């Protein structure tokens, strides 16, 4: 066999890890065994909008997968009430365990029964994994015993006696609680191989910061950014406009816990400024939306701050629009179109009276200029966002594990839309002198979004990237937004409902056509019956009969209303998707009451399941992206074995096998 210099160099590098024929052959055999296993379960979620309790519950329950495993393993032999208790214990072991213990008359017997049930369940969920993989999932401090309990063979000894003796030792040495908790965590770990979050972790919900904590602790997760995410990414990067934008949303819902409690960002200077500047103003239009879960506090103070940051936001929007003509947002620099004496605005040729004409900080001769006090507030907030260690960790995680889109195991994941023309062609959007569409546009947006955080501080490239992050939040041709305009100004200042309409991109009309879904998949290099698009962003109005399944079953929108504000519009509380070795399962969820009720009353989210794609045969690891990489490694290892056997590369010292 002839070897190129490059191939030989690679094989020599590979030989450093696999130093003998035996070592390389053993790895080939190990990989071939892995490739024959069923593919792992993938879990898809989208549009979390800060609803951390519902998110954590669905994450812990794996959208009902764990309860299904419990019912399969324990069946009718265990009462439904006890199965529900066991499910809650697995979801929330640290919180549920003390409550269950307090109820027991014979704690020793309960420990024994619970550990046996958890062992059986854990053996079941680990059955589609190699023993080596399961071992890597076990906690170090008790991994050996867990491994023994999971992989013991009973051909020559009694199972009940073997388990019984080990469990007795665990209980005797006061380790039962620790082992129960570890088993619960391992079951959740093995039930789902990969988590996909298709955007919008941030928004109006009570604690988006707590949502980010969970993916950061997850073993394998990817995120496709939503427009609510990129504006927070821009804020963390140091964009004053993105900061004012996230503050506006936060204050509109009086959600100060996220900023002050979650990220340690003080709004004291802003509060003093707003109190002084708008002390005599009517701020009734600026009162926060009611949500009993967010801090009550002084609503008038929140309203004043809401108005203060909105005016600063409008000024900064005008500045960004002026220095980015290719955003094509001319006319949306509204402060430049207001007649302050008359109290009207020229809105694209129509003159409207303003619902609020009070602009004490605006200079009519230079409406976009911040006052000296506003400059100080903006600078302090930029510094506070930059110095929030927790926020920076969260945003760095979003950049490291997130992207504009992802292709995984034949599926295409993105949050918003592929911009289209009225006739269904990919719309060509021009930035920096070049028109791009489809995948090329997505790749460009991904690069510009990273530029806003990673380019050198103070550089023109970083400023341009931060401006682009704001454009991705609300731009008319932003693939993450997908509407004609974000009508924040119109809803606050103009009474005419016609001015408040946000027209959806033609994409949302064309995705009903199977040819559109297939066209998008081909654009990203995907094809075949098993390839699907997983999309979010636009809540599906299930209450009106709308289906989340579009494009002849090739596109699934899984934004069904995680956000509580959308429940009335959608009629449900969200969709999730499960992709296992049998196919794709859509889960439709009803509203979630609270974690407290789930823990103390064993209340689970009511859900229904629907297979939307059934694989013609069971999907194995060899059929996945990882399987493709493993098969490539087998080819390389086979070439290495041949190189050893032909004497092209010398074997190292044989290790004991």
Annotate each language-model stretch with its function.
Residues 1-657:
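Feature recognizes metal-dependent phosphohydrolase scaffolds
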